[in-house]
Amino acid sequence: MATIKVDVVSAEEQIFSGLAKFVALPGEAGELGILPGHTPLITRIRPGAVRIEAESGDEEFVFVAGGILEVQPGAVTVLADTAIRGKDLDAAKAEEARKRAEETLQNAKSDIDLAKAQSELATAMAQLEAIQRLAKIRGRH
């Protein structure tokens, strides 16, 4: 089966690098599915789960807090603002971040504070959703 080179990187580290049969991630306009031979594309990505079906058939999951996706004929590159391997996601930390963001939202004094709190809340909610999706998938295996 055809494969495509996939790299997921954040400012801190390279999270994934390898060959994949399929990549799914939250694009700006909705969920994107990328197969080998996909049309070249550059777009922003929303906070959420990146699912990579590796060449071996194993699935890798990475949570990204937004970023940029570049698709070229033989490569997919995800440049993430922040990226966390699926196995490293922590529901308690994500829930605490959600609560802090909601509290900050309630106490926002300026438009900048409000926008920052909304962004933090969206990221925390996306992380919790990614954790739930990953738990469901793991439950099927």
UniProtKB/Swiss-Prot annotation:
One cellular-component annotation, GO: proton-transporting ATP synthase complex
Keyword Transport carried by entry: yes
Entry's localization field: Cell inner membrane
Any one Gene Ontology molecular-function term assigned to this protein's record: proton-transporting ATP synthase activity, rotational mechanism
InterPro entries per UniProt: ATP_F1_dsu/esu_C_sf, ATP_synth_F1_dsu/esu, ATP_synth_F1_dsu/esu_N, ATP_synth_F1_esu_C, ATPsynth_dsu/esu_N
Main localization category: membrane
Keyword terms, alphabetized: ATP synthesis, Cell inner membrane, Cell membrane, CF(1), Hydrogen ion transport, Ion transport, Membrane, Transport
Superkingdom of origin organism: Bacteria
A Pfam family reported for this protein in Swiss-Prot or TrEMBL: ATP-synt_DE
Gene3D superfamilies noted in UniProt: ATP synthase delta/epsilon subunit, C-terminal domain, F0F1 ATP synthase delta/epsilon subunit, N-terminal
Bilayer topology term: Peripheral membrane protein
Subunit structure: F-type ATPases have 2 components, CF(1) - the catalytic core - and CF(0) - the membrane proton channel. CF(1) has five subunits: alpha(3), beta(3), gamma(1), delta(1), epsilon(1). CF(0) has three main subunits: a, b and c.
Function: Produces ATP from ADP in the presence of a proton gradient across the membrane.
UniProt xrefs under PANTHER family: ATP SYNTHASE DELTA/EPSILON CHAIN, ATP SYNTHASE EPSILON CHAIN, CHLOROPLASTIC
Sequence similarity: Belongs to the ATPase epsilon chain family.
Protein name in UniProt: ATP synthase epsilon chain
